[in-house]
Amino acid sequence: MKSYIEPFIASKALSQNSQKAYRYDLQQFCQLVGERVNQDKLLLYQNSIANLSLSAKKRKLSTANQFLYYLYQIKYLNSYFRLTDTMKVMRTEKQQAAIINTDIFYQKTPFVWGQLISLLILELGLTPSEVAGIEVANLDLSFQMLTLKTKKGVRVLPLSQILIPFLEQQLVGKEVYLFEHRGIPFSRQWFFNHLKTFVRSIGYEGLTAQKLREQFILKEKLAGKSIIELSDILGLKSPVTLEKYYKS
């Protein structure tokens, strides 16, 4: 996030002294908040300036809010965060998610690992950890089924015909896991990097595993699945987290 400080300052008509003040405040802000903005980190920043004078607080809040809005505008942040004068953190979500056209996800690409990860999430609603845990022995392409074994239990998921060729391609030479190196599953960071590279290559930068899973949820709901049915498909203990998608 620090790398955006200078472009942000350059986007504003500021005097030299104001530029120095902005730069100083934002460097402090980024040092405390880090690269990922969330409510807890903003509250940490709030506490760090709690004992300053009223004028200093207002200046730092104003600078931080302008920077947060800038990051939201350039789509570095998916949600708009704002610190208020009353020292409360307000978080405004974007519009409710809409179904996107996913045709491009199935087109030929050099980023085959990231493509398959994204398709398994889109087609089956899997989490990254569930994708990482897919074992070769539990994939039955003849009957188009995946038996998914997790700590929460066992789920048998149907595989669509369109997904089969992508799986066949990656199954060659695998010993234990679908995603592995000599029988050892890849790290969480490996999955994150490959997914990020693929979605960026097709023009969907910023589309996370969570958002891809949300696409599965939206499509299943549109197809007529009840909240209980969808909860079972996803392996959830309770349908509570799905309630927001079923509100009228």
Swiss-Prot record:
Limits of the Core-binding (CB) domain: 1-72
Top-level taxon: Bacteria
CDD domains, per database record: INT_StrepXerD_C_like
Domain Tyr recombinase: 85-248
Keyword Oxidoreductase listed: no
Entry keywords, A to Z: Cytoplasm, DNA integration, DNA recombination, DNA-binding
Any one annotated GO CC term: cytoplasm
GO terms for MF: DNA binding; tyrosine-based site-specific recombinase activity
Active site: K149, R213, Y245
Segments crossing the lipid bilayer: none
PROSITE patterns noted in UniProt: CB, TYR_RECOMBINASE
Function: Putative tyrosine recombinase. Not involved in the cutting and rejoining of the recombining DNA molecules on dif(SL) site.
Protein name, UniProt field: Tyrosine recombinase XerD-like
